[in-house]
């Protein structure tokens, strides 16, 4: 379990100061945005959340102001400070009458079974686990059996990351619920990106959540842990709730610089709303299970299809940011066709020095020469980019600890006109196995804003430009390079 007392009090502050006098989210938007209500029926307002702080503030404010429902869907929900405080915020919402539904993929659940049961015991809260075949309620020998009896089922995961509030506002993007996705880890953080939405696209996001929630893949924790449930008393439920609330209310759990930052962020929500860009936008998603499952580890999906269609229409420029770069079958040839038509292709990805995934990097290392020979420009992120000073400008004590940064944002810009922000990595797993979500839209203002952000990430102070004569692998130890070499020997590319 990660450190329970890492600094991150944003959630607590906003919940504590906003709940008692909270308007509904819809009413607040009506009162603070003159023409938003009229636009929301047919258009979507969007704001790109580049910094972890503002993404967490947005989630916390919406959690504190929801009056009817909160639906969240995540791949990872850690038991660190962010994860625990978010859980406490959802419990507080349930206690004031909000219907709370949480859907989490099974493979990365690190909460204890008792904790899952205690949180789901509230009459207004429900927790379901997606594809529970490897972690929650699964014993060691059952895990072994599942791995060997149905390899695809073990590898088919729900990579979706969405949070929906009152059916009015939603957030999606690359961030999971853990400290490192919001720039609060003192050792290792992710350069990530989300997008805040209000309006029509949130209806599509809600429909996707309902489809997953009602699917055979989403199993209530009470069903998975039926035997343990019989041992949970009402007194234990009340005690766990008191512990969560007491932790959230105790200022000793939070670093001073975080409290100082909070005081300056509490007024940011209205300016954020005023900065939204309005247009027609599409929320793209996959069906539960990704596809019919009759093509082994292949088969594609709806997200894959729509992104390929968008890329195929490129005329001049494609700018991609993906932390993991392992081209699915036919991917390099597809990009070669675009390049032959005169399309410039640039890709921002992790270096060996920054990556959190040696297996995925080994797949990229095997393809790197072909990618460069095809004419693709590749930029590998530095572990200590100059940009981190901007990302952490309000947290000088974290800067002093010198944390590594790695890319985790999944974004795309086509011809400075079409953009995508979501969960899709440029690898076989996202193409064929994991369910993915994101926002795909044609809007020049947001596309240019996103392109400027990615282009900042690929500047020399933040990334290495990889060529046929140079790559930055020598920046790491021989031991780490050896791990890449060993992984390249394994037949694991379809699941990378």
Predicted regions, residues:
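Charged, low-complexity intrinsically disordered terminal segments
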Residues: 18-161, 165-496
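Positively charged n-region of N-terminal signal peptides that target proteins for export
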Residues: 1-4
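Bacterial N-terminal signal peptides
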Residues: 7-16
């Amino acid at each position: 379990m990660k450190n329970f007392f890492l600094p991150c009090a944003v959630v607590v502050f906003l919940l504590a100061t906003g709940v008692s006098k909270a308007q509904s989210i819809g009413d607040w938007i009506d009162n603070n945005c003159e023409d938003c209500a009229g636009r929301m029926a047919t258009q979507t307002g969007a704001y790109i959340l580049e910094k972890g702080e503002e993404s967490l503030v947005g989630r916390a404010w919406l959690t504190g102001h929801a009056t009817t429902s909160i639906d969240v869907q995540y791949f990872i929900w850690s038991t660190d400070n962010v994860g625990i405080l978010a859980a406490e915020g959802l419990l507080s919402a349930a206690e004031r009458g909000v219907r709370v539904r949480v859907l989490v993929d099974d493979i990365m659940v690190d909460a204890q079974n008792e904790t899952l049961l205690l949180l789901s015991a509230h009459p207004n809260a429900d927790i379901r686990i997606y594809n529970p075949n490897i972690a929650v309620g699964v014993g060691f020998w059952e895990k072994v059996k599942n791995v060997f009896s149905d390899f695809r089922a073990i590898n088919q995961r729900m990579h979706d990351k969405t949070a929906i509030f009152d059916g009015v506002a939603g957030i999606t993007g690359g961030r999971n619920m853990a400290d490192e996705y919001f720039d609060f880890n003192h050792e290792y953080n992710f350069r990530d990106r989300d997008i805040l939405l209000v309006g029509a696209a949130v209806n599509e996001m809600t429909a996707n959540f309902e489809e997953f929630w009602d699917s055979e893949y989403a199993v209530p924790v009470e069903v998975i842990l039926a035997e343990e449930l019989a041992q949970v008393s009402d007194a234990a439920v009340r005690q766990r709730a008191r512990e969560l609330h007491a932790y959230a209310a105790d200022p000793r759990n939070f670093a001073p610089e975080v409290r100082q930052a909070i005081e300056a962020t509490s007024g940011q929500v209205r300016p954020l709303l005023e900065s939204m860009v309005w247009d027609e936008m599409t929320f793209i998603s996959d069906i539960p299970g990704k596809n019919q499952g009759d093509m082994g580890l292949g088969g594609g999906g709806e997200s894959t299809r729509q992104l390929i269609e968008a890329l195929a229409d490129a005329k001049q420029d494609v700018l991609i940011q993906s932390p993991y770069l392992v081209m699915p079958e036919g991917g390099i040839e597809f990009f070669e066709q675009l390049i032959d038509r005169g399309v410039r292709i640039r890709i921002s990805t992790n270096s060996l020095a920054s990556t959190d995934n040696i297996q995925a990097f080994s797949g990229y290392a095997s393809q790197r020469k072909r990618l460069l020979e095809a004419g693709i420009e590749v930029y590998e992120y530095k572990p200590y980019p100059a940009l981190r000073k901007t990302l952490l400008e309000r947290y000088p004590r974290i800067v002093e600890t010198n944390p590594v940064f790695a890319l985790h944002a999944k974004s795309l810009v086509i011809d400075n006109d079409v953009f995508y922000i979501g969960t899709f990595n440029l690898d076989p797993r996202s193409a064929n196995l994991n369910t993915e979500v994101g926002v795909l839209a044609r809007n020049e203002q947001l596309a240019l804003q996103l392109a400027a952000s990615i282009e900042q990430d690929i500047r020399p102070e933040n990334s290495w430009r990889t060529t046929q004569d140079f790559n930055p692998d020598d920046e790491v130890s021989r031991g780490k390079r050896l791990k890449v070499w060993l992984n390249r020997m394994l037949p694991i590319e379809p699941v990378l």
